[in-house]
Each structure stands twice: as structure tokens, then as C-alpha cells.
Amino acid sequence: MRPPFSITDKMLKLTVEITQAVTLLELQHQRDLHLRKENRIRSIHSSLAIEQNTLSLEQVTAIIAGKRVLGEPKEIREVQNAYEAYEEVFKFDPYSIENLLAAHRLMTKGLVKESGAFRERDVGVYDGNGTVVHIGARPQFVYGLVDDLFKWAKKTDIPALIKSCVVHFELEMIHPFLDGNGRMGRLWQNLLLAKWQPVFEWIPIETLVYKHQKQYYELLAVGDHENDSTKFIEFMLEIILEASLTYSKHTKQAGWDDRIKRLREVEQKFFAKIYPTLRYSQGITTSKAAELTGKTQSTTRRYLLKLVSLDVLEAVGKNKDRHYVLRDTGKH
């Protein structure tokens, strides 16, 4: 069953803007290993801080580096577990209940007795005044609801960006675990995004959620009250765009931005379609690029030569053996 939400013009606009931003980031993110690790640590710190973990970013960094830190043992263990979960989860299948439970086991081992298992009793979410603000699904329905959600997510053809927000929201509403639901919802959205664009493995979306956590919780509550996640989806897409643009500011030194921006919009879309093949293979031929983009051979050849002239691609070989490869961004 399709979860209740509407696809709005605002969502589609944000989806286009995010796609354009991450196309540039995909070209850059592997270049800076230090920045990648720093962003993962920021993600872990922020996701735990949202759940009231009081350790500072500096303390979290030290714990992950294996150093001794003064702090509550439970909070230190949360950091260690989260780091292990983030290191492993991007190998997982986002539509597998077994993998969801395995990730929860990594996230909560040594912290809760029900680690790696769906809850078997009712649970409520309370605000600071002790008022119940949300009641999770009855325990006997949890497995079926998660199963239905994952089956829908696997089959749907809506954009991955929107789908990831829907899954995040629905997991929070189902509240399948006794503890760790918020961390798992955010982690699972990251996994879905990374399966679409690997750069999302390193974009610290949680840092922006932490920054806007009041609105985050308000829109979860609105979606719960209205039984419709539309406003939450729009909010999360804004967060993802802000995170992508923030990350981009730290990677502009790679030199891709200026070169890609010199392409016309139709040429940028052409490049976005052939980029995965360029990245994961030994290059691309004119024929293959034409097949992937639906362009004619002559148009494809012209676009490829434009990319060569901008030092984005390099032409290798002659005549029938000619193919195109990505230039090493580190040289520019």
C-alpha cells in the first residue's frame, strides 16, 4: 500500500536542484578522504545529539580515534556503536528487514536488551512535559507494516529523494523498536540516498537536521496528526539541498564547478547520464554515450568533444578504438 503523501511542485523543484548539486559532488567527493571522515563524524555526533547524547564533537572525534574520554559509559558506547553501524550499513540492502534488524543490532548492542529485534510491547513518545505526542503501531503489526513499506519502496518509481523521505517518516511513525528509532530512521534514509548517489554516504544530513531539530519534530508531529507526510518530505528535501550545498563549498577547490557550469543545461544533463558509466568502467564510447542519453551520434560526439575541451574528459585511442575517460581532478 502506498503511504499517504502528495508529490508537489516544490518537491519536484527541490529534487532537480539536489540532483544538480550532487552531480558535481560525485565528481569531487573521492578526492578528499579527510573531509569524508570528518563528515561521517559530524553525522554521528549530530544524530546522537538529536537523541540527547551530550558528548561534544571533539569528544566524539576522540572516541572514534580510540582515545580515552571522560563521559557517561552509555553515551560513549552509543558513539562506538554508531560508528560501527555507519561503517557497515552502506553495504546493506535498504529493502531487507533482516538488514534493518542487523543495523539496529550494531547501533544498540550493549545498550538495550532488545537489540536487533522489533519491540514486543506498546510504546509511546513523550514531550518534555510528559505528554504523549505519538503512539507507535501495536507490536503485532510492526513486522507487517515494515514489510509493506519496504515492498512499496522497492517497487515504486517515484524519485529516490522523495522515497527516502517517505521511508524515514514512516519508520518514525511505525516506531518499530523500543529504542533507537530516530537514529535508525535517519540512517535508513542515508542508505536509500547512497544507493541512488554514493556521495550521500558522506554528506552530513544529520548535522542540518540537528540544526533544525525543532522544525524536524514539529513536522513529524504534523504528519502524524494529518496522516500525511507531504510537509515533512518538503522539509527534508530542503535539508538535503542545504547539506549538499554546504558540502559543495568545501569541495570547490577540485575545480569541477567552474568547468561544469560552462556547459549548457542540456549538456549538463547529458553528462549526468553518462557519469555513472564513466566512473565505474574503463571509459565510454560515442555509441554507448548515445545509447545512454538518446542523442544522435553527431550530437553525442559534439557534447563529448565539449567535455574534452573543458578538461572534464580525456579522449583515448583513435578512430574505432576511441573512448572517453574522466580526467583526474587532482591535477587541476
Q: Which residues does each predicted region cover?
A:
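FIC/Doc superfamily catalytic core
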Residues: 1-332
